[in-house]
Amino acid sequence: MNAKIVVLPGDGIGPEVTAEAVRVLEAVARRGGHALSFTERLMGGCSIDAHGTALTPEVLADCQAADAVLLGAVGGPKWDDPRAKVRPEQGLLGLRKGLGVFANLRPVRVHPSLLDSSPLRPEKLRGVDIMVIRELTGGLYFGQPKGRDVKDGHARAVDTLEYQDFEVRRVVELAFRIAKGRKKKVTSVDKANVLESSRLWRELATAIGQANPDVALDHMLVDTAAMRLVTSPATLDVVVTENMFGDILTDEASVLAGSMGMLPSASIGEQGPGLYEPIHGSAPDIAGKGIANPVGTVLSAALLLRHSLGLEPEAAAIERAVDQTITDGCRTADLGGKLSTRAMADEILKRLA
């Protein structure tokens, strides 16, 4: 297979972890006889410094023309002024919109060797294997009208929570397709006791559930879901929810694994390139020290192979190598170990079958 991958290292530790993920992808490609080409481009704070914008039209066009996009991280204190007109995160939102991705997939699996690394008791974590699917293009983050003004002498801010039926259907249908390859259970999270948009969401999810009787569907209010994630996470399989709820719940779920550096994500649409990135931030406090955990980015590369290139054996090989590396006791600083970013990737490469 020939494939073009755009790499957006971004800010902070982004360049360090993406470099190791590219090494792993190159190794897998050599073994499988695939020709993967990698092109690096600027996005985020580094792009603001160089071009005055977080995402240039040229970089977006390159990403749209690629087979997949691998992202490191964006943002940092240098650009962290909420009053700024240009912020690194705008690049990420623009990229998602430009690529047409509508669903963010975040697998959360607790490795048996890392049960003691989580703030939760080990007995609550055994068997945790969750796929959280977050809708990406609707809701409060994109609804209009949006803005600030003065009304009756008082400052006012407005955000709009809006969903159209097709936006809900496509992400819930994706959740059911994914569930059929797992434990055949979907939990749809909403706030239908208060929000009209959540009532529409629940109605549509119910209809999709009726059309897929082989998959169990249950509805859960978002506050209950937040509690379930820390009281009995092993009871959850595929969780699907709207944009802001998903943003919050996925960050909560990330602590289950013991370190945010362990977890990958994939943002996919109906067609076109997917966007793959670790869930952690730019971690400016450790940037340049060579101690960041590359596992989340390496596992994001595995998702890239699976969802954008259709290379399931190669994706599974990376995941097995990561599992064995963790089982063998290899750890970066976030997990109480001493391995550098490069050394951790070296250990993964040694175990690639």
Swiss-Prot record:
Residues that coordinate or bind Mg(2+): 223, 247, 251
GO biological process: L-leucine biosynthetic process
UniProt cofactor note: Binds 1 Mg(2+) or Mn(2+) ion per subunit.
EC number: 1.1.1.85
Family matches, as SMART domains: Iso_dh
Compartment annotation: Cytoplasm
Top-tier EC class: oxidoreductase
Marked site: Important for catalysis: 141, 191
UniProt catalytic activity: (2R,3S)-3-isopropylmalate + NAD(+) = 4-methyl-2-oxopentanoate + CO2 + NADH
Domain of life: Bacteria
Chain positions recorded as substrate binding sites: 96, 106, 134, 223
Keywords on record: Amino-acid biosynthesis, Branched-chain amino acid biosynthesis, Cytoplasm, Leucine biosynthesis, Magnesium, Manganese, Metal-binding, NAD, Oxidoreductase
Binding-site residues for NAD(+), renumbered to this chain: 76-89, 281-293
Keyword Acetylation: no
Pathway: Amino-acid biosynthesis; L-leucine biosynthesis; L-leucine from 3-methyl-2-oxobutanoate: step 3/4
Cofactor: Mg(2+); Mn(2+)
InterPro entries in alphabetical order: IsoCit/isopropylmalate_DH_CS, IsoPropMal-DH-like_dom, Isopropylmalate_DH
Gene Ontology molecular function terms on file: 3-isopropylmalate dehydrogenase activity; magnesium ion binding; NAD binding
GO cellular component: cytosol
Subunit details: Homodimer.
UniProt family annotation: Belongs to the isocitrate and isopropylmalate dehydrogenases family. LeuB type 1 subfamily.
HAMAP family reported for this sequence: LeuB_type1
Known role: Catalyzes the oxidation of 3-carboxy-2-hydroxy-4-methylpentanoate (3-isopropylmalate) to 3-carboxy-4-methyl-2-oxopentanoate. The product decarboxylates to 4-methyl-2 oxopentanoate.
Protein name: 3-isopropylmalate dehydrogenase
Lineage: Bacteria, Pseudomonadati, Myxococcota, Myxococcia, Myxococcales
